[in-house]
Amino acid sequence: DGIRDVAVTGVQTCALPIWYVATHGAPPHPGALQTDHDVVGYFSSLTGRVMPLLFERDGERIDVDVRSRHGVFVNESTAHLTALVSGLGVGQTFGFMARPHLASGALVRVLPEWSRPLHPLHIVFHPSRNQSARLRAFVDWVVELFAPYDCSARR
């Protein structure tokens, strides 16, 4: 079929504590990110569209449109994380990427009472009846690599 579920992963809203949070304070509500804070965000390399920040709490969902905000907008996850760790603003990044930086104190969670919907990860490959052993081994390795970060019911 050419697609395999890898994991369902969480997304963390983070900022650099020693510069960004110390200077600007933590946002009190997701809506404050639209008016009072610098944002590190993503844009689509295909469409140029800036992705909103998404928040959920107790059945309430807020989509924060950050297109008009000051900040940095990138289309690559390592650049995004680097911008966060450099103190350029508040952003949402995959939990598995943020984990070591949160553990070391380089990043802190902001708006911890709000979560972002879980994000599915998939691996896509050319479908073939005669799938090579190398491809199967690679796909299995990727699934195994992400298993510790899988928040789905499969765990």
Q: Where do the model's predicted regions map?
A:
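Single conserved hydrophobic/aromatic residue that forms the stacking wall/gate
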Residues: D1-C14
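Alpha-helical segments flanking ligand/cofactor-binding loops in enzyme cores
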Residues: G31, L81-T82, R136
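C-terminal effector-binding regulatory domain of bacterial HTH transcription factors
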Residues: G95-P100, S104, W114-R155
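Short loop->beta-strand "edge-of-pocket" segments that line small-molecule binding or catalytic clefts
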Residues: P30-E56
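Hydrophobic hinge/microswitch elements
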Residues: R61-R109, R116
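Flexible hinge/capping segments at coil-to-helix
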Residues: Q12-V40
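Small-molecule pocket liners
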Residues: T13-W19, H37, L53, I62, ...
